[in-house]
Amino acid sequence: MVAGTRCLLALLLPQVLLGGAAGLIPELGRRKFAASSGRPSPQPSDDILSEFELRLLSMFGLKQRPTPSRDAVVPPYMLDLYRRHSGQPGAPAPDHRLERAASRANTVRSFHHEESLEELPETSGKTTRRFFFNLTSIPPEEFITSAELQVFREQMQEALGDDSGFHHRINIYEIIKPATANSKFPATRLLDTRLVNQNTSRWESFDVTPAVMRWTAQGHANHGFVVEVTHLEEKQGVSKRHVRISRSLHPDEHSWSQIRPLLVTFGHDGKGHPLHRREKRQAKHKQRKRLKSSCKRHPLYVDFSDVGWNDWIVAPPGYHAFYCHGECPFPLADHLNSTNHAIVQTLVNSVNSKIPKACCVPTELSAISMLYLDENEKVVLKNYQDMVVEGCGCR
């Protein structure tokens, strides 16, 4: 029953995508596909469309169709992560730390901090900021397996050609108890630390898994992080602003969006397999004579721009879903990938037409990775199971 339901969903999903769903697929997308099909099709009732909409949104883990603003920003980190796990040519080199984190997760989420909550008292030789990330959009059923805080540090002109000096130490703390009237500094717990030499520009990644797990799985209050930059060499004229833990006075929005701090969570909702690097599958060539009408896989490309979903689905722009269609004639040939039950059912059908023939259905399905903006304009990379037909057979 479960396999049959999955096969049905695999077949119905492209039909819903291409046929339209009220509210989920805009009217423009439905008209566009109807015009390209060249023939009129009966319109499903509003009740059926609403039911399909609910099912599709549930599959994506969404409560409503995302409608992101034009100012929504997709962090380059998330784009690179998508390219890695979708096996795209020109993707960044493999990162063993990222591969390890993704191997236990099927969902990656990114969060920007709330800038209005940054300020902390300055101390001599240190730069400190509070980072608060609102994580309430993480579903309760999603178990966080790892989390990292990404901070960008810029190359200092004073450090060029000097490998011996200009070191900073970056400390990341979890806020256990916020500052009070009696104490201007919050109570903290050290999570990660790193000594850096600022002779190059690069992102630094810090492990904040223990804190995020306490906030999401154990119900502890989320008071945010403290990022502390300790200036180890006090030299005349040396800038202390090389670590981008706060916005400059007059930056343009695009530049700031590319280097602002980012919290990335890796989680698993218990559905399907973890993220993996998708390898291109080799077609199985079998030298057998097949009837043109026999059960086999047919091309079906779902283009998200055609149905008006490209405003919230970042990547891929579409995908090859394929579908199964064809006859399951008696006697069933070996290449039709039939079960014993299908063989018996086809045999009985040959002598009793009241018993239906075996059906041409997907026998093997695979997942795709999708990068999209959710209802809260948070960027999500998620692995969706049973989205691509890999093989067909008579069942």
From Swiss-Prot:
Is Disulfide bond among this UniProt entry's keywords? yes
Report whether Signal shows up as a keyword of the record: yes
Which positions are listed as propeptide?
A: 24-281
The UniProt family comment states: Belongs to the TGF-beta family.
Recorded superkingdom: Eukaryota
Function text: Growth factor of the TGF-beta superfamily that plays essential roles in many developmental processes, including cardiogenesis, neurogenesis, and osteogenesis. Induces cartilage and bone formation. Initiates the canonical BMP signaling cascade by associating with type I receptor BMPR1A and type II receptor BMPR2. Once all three components are bound together in a complex at the cell surface, BMPR2 phosphorylates and activates BMPR1A. In turn, BMPR1A propagates signal by phosphorylating SMAD1/5/8 that travel to the nucleus and act as activators and repressors of transcription of target genes.
Which residues of this chain are annotated as glycosylation sites? 134, 199, 337
Which region ranges are annotated with the description Disordered?
270-292
Please give the subunit comment from the record. Answer: Homodimer; disulfide-linked. Interacts with SOSTDC1. Interacts with GREM2, RGMA, RGMB and RGMC. Interacts with ASPN. Interacts with MAFP5. Interacts with FBN1 (via N-terminal domain) and FBN2. Interacts with type I receptor BMPR1A. Interacts with type II receptor BMPR2. Interacts with SCUBE3. Interacts with TNFAIP6 (primarily via Link domain); this interaction is inhibited by hyaluronan. Interacts with ERFE. Interacts with BMPR1A/ALK3; the interaction may induce HAMP expression.
Q: Which UniProt keywords apply?
A: Chondrogenesis, Cleavage on pair of basic residues, Cytokine, Developmental protein, Differentiation, Disulfide bond, Glycoprotein, Growth factor, Osteogenesis, Phosphoprotein, Secreted, Signal
Quick one: which gene encodes this?
BMP2
Q: Which residues form a coiled coil?
A: none
Gene3D superfamilies (UniProt xref): 2.60.120.970, Cystine-knot cytokines (2.10.90.10)
- Biased-composition ranges, Basic residues, are 273-292
Localization in the cell: Secreted
InterPro entries named among the record's database cross-references: BMP2_TGF_beta-like, Cystine-knot_cytokine, TGF-b_C, TGF-b_propeptide, TGF-beta-rel, TGFb_CS
According to the UniProt record, list the residues that bear Phosphoserine: 86
Organism listed in the record = Oryctolagus cuniculus (Rabbit)
Location, primary (coarse class): secreted
Q: Which GO terms describe its cellular component?
A: cell surface; extracellular space
Tell me the protein's name. Answer: Bone morphogenetic protein 2
Q: Which GO terms describe its biological process?
A: BMP signaling pathway; cardiac epithelial to mesenchymal transition; cardiocyte differentiation; cartilage development; epithelial to mesenchymal transition; heart development; heart induction; lung vasculature development
Organism lineage: Eukaryota, Metazoa, Chordata, Craniata, Vertebrata
Question: May I ask which residue range the UniProt record assigns to the signal sequence?
Answer: 1-23
The entry lists its GO molecular-function terms as: BMP receptor binding; cytokine activity; growth factor activity; phosphatase activator activity
Which cysteines does the record link by disulfide bonds?
295-360, 324-392, 328-394
